Amino acid sequence: GSEMCIRDRRKEGISIPIIVMNPEFSSFNVLFENQLEPEVYSFRLLDAMIKETERRGITSYPIHIKIDTGMHRLGFQPEDVPEVCRRLKEQSGVVARSVFSHLVGSDSYIFDDFTKKQLDTFTRVAAELEAGLEYKVIKHILNSAGIERFTDYQMDMVRLGIGLYGVSASGQKGLRNISTLKTTILQIQNVPAGDSIGYSRMSYVKRD
């Protein structure tokens, strides 16, 4: 599974930092054994990480603080930052290497006002975190569409997702697709104009 894949990558000499998104408590052994850096999104997970580093006698283990600026899946709330700083400063087991958030609709112009609000919130919260911790952290929020459309917010790092496959989330033509989908035509039907095709009747035929 994924644990074997990670171990194999480390054995092959891949030594660069690897961030683990949405880690589970049951994965702590794999995290520490393979020097993986977890996303930390809640006080429960933060406290568990601190406790585990203390148990193992580890100091300054890198973690990545996730802030919820509008996706509402995982992440600390912006108002949690002072308490996050307090808990980090009163221990030595973990250290914040980066702070990040996730954009909801950076691929669509209709969400630009909301995206700008997310970007402004993150900029403010990241500065508050750095001020509270009294050291600099890596800041990143842009996904594939954000990289293309909000270049002023590339900060210290960006996260290229679907763009790795040459697919533009916002219709840009500068990326080269790395894969090709091929299939075989099994049947050709004559469908009268006005009839629907496929699930949920989402597509209608305009002509015979």
For each predicted feature, which ranges?
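Active-site-proximal beta-alpha core segment in soluble small-molecule metabolic enzymes
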Residues: G1-I138, Q154
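Anionic-ligand-binding alpha/beta catalytic cores of soluble enzymes and soluble regulatory domains
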Residues: D112-R207
